[in-house]
Swiss-Prot record:
Protein name: CTP synthase
Phylogenetic lineage: Archaea, Methanobacteriati, Methanobacteriota, Stenosarchaea group, Methanomicrobia
CDD domains registered for this protein in UniProt: CTPS_N, GATase1_CTP_Synthase
Subunit structure: Homotetramer.
One annotated GO molecular function: ATP binding
SUPFAM superfamilies: Class I glutamine amidotransferase-like, P-loop containing nucleoside triphosphate hydrolases
Sites where the protein binds UTP: S12, K191, T192, K193, P194, T195, Q196, K227
């Protein structure tokens, strides 16, 4: 097993996750099996109960793990399915160590950061690296991203564990990649001092980077690379420029041009095979059309809806269509804001803030024949809207939202649940689709698997009346309704599951493909009119 550990310096938000995924992609293009591990130094057990406005999207894995959005990028870039063990948090590590202490596993020893916590971290990394990710063989290379910034107190035990692993492994079995910021001053000169100090801080922890990925607004020239090399003892060939890119899927190509894959293969004693260019062809698809999609959302932070954004890109590329997103605040938007968009999307979420605005948007889409895609909460609100304005039950609502006629009810198994973390209906579930429906046409089959994250469902008492009124429940999982659609609408589809969590550039999500295609048709018909 080969390890590539990615750390970050100077500041957070430099793109360590994309860098990690991109390096993995470069190796995968050369025929190597790649897996990935994300270390999050926070004390939370997982991301499931964290505020999306602070943390960004909660990505859901196939086994139900609620994790950092970086794991979503790993899956999309590497075409793999990760598991909960691929996300290591301080909370998990400390919980495991405390449970071992309570069982007496340490035979009365005084439990300390070193060796007990660091040993647990090393075990977690090794175990995750050995876990097969697509049901095949164990990976050749494991990418390990250490979250946070060098110098953060929360990261110290993890970096110490990395130092120990680095010392125990052969030089060709582990390399360190350090991502830093190289800002440009008002005169247009690159400033290397932040990188110098960042590497100095890393060295003080006993870690010397093998490769420096220099993040900047523009390409870093040879002189700047030479200066960084001189002050960090990293060879010039291993100082890699990573400029800002308009599309994250361009980054592997840019790093390929910088020769990063050649350096990595050399350091890890891997055969530097001729890279397969199929993935590059997919992500370099040129656009011949453009559509505008309104996302009516609760949060004004795009990272909260990362997988939705990327899934629209995936579908757009497959259809040679650029998807422009218009973000609308569910509490403040006006209906005229929807008049010139080509489609409307309501994402998942929790809580009642912004609910009425989202229902107004859904009604507008239904009545004005605008393509509509509803996801999770967007599915539940579509049912509520239909119940109110077609069945005429004006106080229809969800049990989550308070008093009224509960057309959306809590799942029976959730009624006695008290803890919030890790207790929802999570991960992959089998869904059966009805023959002859829109959704079956999109998937091309009647048995599918999709990922879930919810506590509420369509109240079975209302299903017959809703279907009699024209709403078709075209997908089910046992007694649960999973998909609804309206047959006499250009495109009106809502899913209880989150299809965006299984979408990638090479395998765009069928509901998103159908939605973007419908947006194209809607735009064309509008232009004709």
């Amino acid at each position: 097993m080969k390890y590539i550990v990615v750390t970050g310096g100077v500041m957070s938000g430099l793109g360590k996750g994309i860098t990690t995924a991109s390096i993995g992609r470069l190796l995968k293009n050369r025929g190597y099996q790649v897996t990935a591990v994300k270390i999050d130094p926070y004390l939370n057990i997982d991301a499931g109960t964290m505020n999306p406005a602070q943390h960004g999207e909660v990505f859901v894995l196939s086994d139900g793990g609620e994790v950092d959005l970086d794991l979503g990028n790993y899956e999309r870039f590497l075409d793999i399915n990760l598991k909960s063990i691929h996300n290591i948090t301080t909370g998990k590590v400390y919980r495991n160590v405390i449970e071992k202490e309570r069982r007496g596993d340490f035979l009365g020893a005084t439990v300390q950061i070193i060796p007990h916590i660091t040993d647990e971290i090393r075990y977690c990394i090794s175990r995750a690296a050995q876990e097969t990710v697509n049901g095949g063989k164990v990976a050749d290379v494991c990418m390990v991203e250490v979250g946070g910034t060098v110098g953060d107190i929360e990261s110290m035990p993890f970096l110490e564990a990395v130092r120990q692993m680095h010392g125990d492994l052969a030089p060709e079995d582990m390399i360190l990649v350090h991502v830093t910021l190289v800002p440009m001053d008002t005169m247009g000169d690159f400033k290397t001092k932040p990188t110098q100090h960042s590497v100095k801080a890393l060295r003080e922890l006993g870690l010397q980077p093998d490769i420096i990925v220099a993040r900047s607004s523009d390409v870093i020239g040879p002189q700047t690379k030479k200066k960084i090399s001189t002050f960090t003892d990293v060879p010039v060939k291993a100082v890699v420029s990573a400029k800002d890119a308009p599309d994250i899927y361009q980054i592997p190509m840019e790093l390929e041009k910088e020769g990063l894959a050649d350096v990595v293969c050399s350091y890890l004693s891997l055969e530097n095979r001729e890279p397969d260019t199929a993935w590059y062809r997919v992500v370099s698809q040129e656009y011949t059309n453009r559509v505008t999609v309104a996302i009516v959302s609760k949060y004004g932070i795009e990272d909260v809806y990362m997988s939705i954004k990327e899934s629209l890109k995936h579908a757009g590329r497959a259809l040679s269509t650029e998807v422009n997103i218009r973000w609308l605040d569910a509490e403040t938007f006006e209906l005229h804001d929807l008049a010139d968009v080509d489609g409307i999307l309501i994402p998942g979420g929790f809580g009642k803030r912004g609910i009425e605005g989202k229902i107004r948007a859904i009604r507008y889409a239904r009545e004005n024949k605008k393509p509509y895609l509803g996801l999770c909460l967007g599915f539940q609100l579509a049912v509520i809207e239909y119940t109110r304005h077609v069945l005429g039950i004006e106080d229809a609502t969800s049990e989550e939202m308070g008093d009224g006629t509960h057309v959306i009810a809590i799942l029976p198994e959730q009624e006695e649940v008290s803890d919030l973390g890790g207790t929802m209906r999570l991960g992959d579930c089998d869904v059966v689709l009805k023959d002859g429906t829109k959704v079956t046409g999109l998937y091309g089959k009647t048995a599918i698997v999709e990922r879930h994250r919810h506590r509420y469902e369509v109240n079975p008492a209302f299903i017959a009346d809703l279907e009699a009124a024209g709403l078709v429940f075209s997908g089910t999982c046992g007694p649960r309704m999973e998909v609804c659609e309206i047959p006499n609408h250009p495109f009106y589809l809502a899913t209880q599951f989150h299809p965006e969590f299984r979408s990638s550039p090479t395998k765009p999500s069928p509901p998103y493909i159908g939605f973007v295609e419908a947006c194209k048709k809607n735009k064309s018909s509008s232009e004709i009119r």
